[in-house]
Amino acid sequence: MKKWLCAASLGLALAASASVQAAKIAIVNVSRIFQQLPESETVAKQLENEFKGRATELQGMESDLQTKMQKLQRDGSTMKASDRTKLENDVMKQRETFSTKAQAFEQDNRRRQMEERNKILSRIQDAVKSVASKGGYDVVIDANAVAYADPSKDITADVLKQVK
């Protein structure tokens, strides 16, 4: 009875190990796909146009502020005390306004870039899932996360075709 039980458990163990397959792994270069997509350039130009007015306004404010600061340095010692104080206060207020607007501009610009980038990355992710399921891959790893991979395991071109 013990021999039979031992033989049966050994047979089950061998059968279980035989049915376990190695995971089918692929790699994909997401950053290369992102760079090669025409939408990346389109989005960059769109964002540039979206923030162009505010950037121009900030450049004008900066130029005006620099002019006033130069005037204060150049003529400050010969100005009336009241005029110098008025100009100093004006420069401080304008500097604060500029700083606030510049920070808001940077935050808004960064936020919009992330929104658009995430939209594109979502499309890439969907394409990776589709190509992986069609190819029967169990695991897909970003090419930047591995030191070496067999080029035959690279599905970047297939994903790029799917995204375009």
UniProtKB/Swiss-Prot annotation:
SMART domains: OmpH. Residues 101-112 are annotated as: Lipopolysaccharide binding. GO terms for biological process: chaperone-mediated protein folding; protein stabilization. Pfam families: OmpH. One of its GO terms (cellular component) is periplasmic space. The keyword Cell division does not apply. It is found in: Periplasm. One of its GO terms (molecular function) is unfolded protein binding. It comes from the Bacteria. SUPFAM superfamilies: OmpH-like (SSF111384). Residues 1-22 form the signal peptide. Its main location: periplasm. InterPro entries: Chaperone_Skp, Skp_dom_sf. The keyword Disulfide bond does not apply. Keywords: Chaperone, Periplasm, Signal. Molecular chaperone that interacts specifically with outer membrane proteins, thus maintaining the solubility of early folding intermediates during passage through the periplasm. Homotrimer. NCBIfam families: PRK10780.1 (NF008047). Belongs to the Skp family. This is Chaperone protein Skp.
